[in-house]
Amino acid sequence: MKNLFTLLIAFFVSFPGFAQLRSLSLQEVVAMAKEQSIASKQAVTARKTNYWQYRSFQADYKPQLSLNGTIPGFTRSYIQVTQPDGTISFEQVSNNNSLLNLSLSQSIALTGGTVYVQQQTQRFDDFARNNTRYNGIPFEIGISQPLFRFNTLKWDRKIQPLKYQEGNQQFIQSLEQIALDATGYYFELLVAQVNLQIAEKNRSNNDTLYKIAQHKLALGKISQNDLLQLQMGLLTAQKDLASAQQAAAVASLKLKMYMGSRDERELELEIPLEAAEFAINTRLALDEAFANRSAAVGFRRKLLEAEQEVQFAKKENGLNASLNATFGLSNQGARPSDVYMNPQDREFVELQFTLPIMTWGRNKARTEVAKANKEFAQQSVEQDKLTFEQEIFTQVTLLQMLQKQVKLTKLADNIAADRYQIAKERFILSDLSVTDLGIATQEKDIARRDYILALRDYWQSYYSLRILTLYDFEQNKKIAY
């Protein structure tokens, strides 16, 4: 008996009519897409990349400790040696020349230079003569300072934090874009499911009405033409049902793929209600958009980068100089300890420069190109700001209009459904023509679809405004993840 019960359960579960359904709301689909979709994983990876790029930038302004050297530096060969009389002889050499250098350096953002301290040890082994010598720098301090040149460190310090902030805001925008995309796929399936429900109901209703019409024809209450019209309606309903089933299957697959879901259960989507009606202050929307959006940060970054190009062109096309100076102690000897006994002063000063004298206007041309690019960037940013503001105004107005539109289409849906029910009952009582019944059916279907499409437009507009402002107007707070 127990085995029979188990077999019955397995039969009903596997039978198509008893297929398991998974009911999902719009909020659940959005949450799943943000959590497990490929797009969400790409957004997380992009945020990690942005974080480590900024960490790398910060590290450039901190002291750098490094150890470099050559161990071993072994050579065994014949080399030419010029003799006092001008002749050349070839002598065998066999030696090892090893070097270790420990250096601590610090970049100076204000000037673009570098200061450093270092210690160096060198050992030379002459295997042919069985001789070993040591040379070393126990201590040395130095500076490398560009003069009249472009300061990359200074400008990076202005631009890189903006890039980091821009990347963080882009991550939030990416998740909100995922919510918008998921909403699109959600309503694509929901519309398909509603069309399927309409098609199933229309097929069932047309089948019932056709059978009633056959009985009426036998009683002489309707004409043969009316019966044929109802038969055509039944065939059309059957064809629409097949198309609706295919569309629903395709839309379901697309939604599952976007969510990253491998659940084989059929999806049954809930018809979402519109969000609680809330007032949207256009000024607040603009302020939040310019405070939160990555594009707003990008406006400042683009202007700084344009100014950076101008400064680079001016600095690098004129007098360029570089000052290198060191001061330290050095010594040599037969033992390592000899290097540290009574070391001698070690100084080095070098000033290198390049002064363009005749360039045939090349340097001026480069500077003018940079200035023109800066002017173009300013104009582009100004245009982008105007477009940005226009998008906010448009989206705020659209959402406010759609809040009202949803209520009207919902009311029209209820009225059309009631009207169809009355028309159907009147037709059964032979109080309504086939044509009028068909009109009521079409109006019912159109009103239902219009309501679902109005909901789709509303929720897409809702999430679009969130993307544009990165602000939650329901909760009155900034969006953060």
Stretch-by-stretch model annotation:
Residues 1-26:
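Bacterial Sec-dependent N-terminal signal peptides
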Residues 69-141, 269-281, 311, 324-355, ...:
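Small/polar, glycine/serine/threonine/aspartate-rich low-complexity segments that form flexible
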Residues 30-34, 86-89, 226-227, 261-324, ...:
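Amphipathic alpha-helical coiled-coil scaffold segments and their short linker/junction regions
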Residues 66, 73-75, 82, 263, ...:
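Acidic, low-complexity, intrinsically disordered peripheral segments
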Residues 42-57, 174, 178-199, 215, ...:
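Amphipathic alpha-helical coiled-coil segments
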Residues 158-164, 168-288, 398, 402, ...:
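Periplasmic alpha-helical coiled-coil/stalk elements that build and connect Gram-negative outer-membrane
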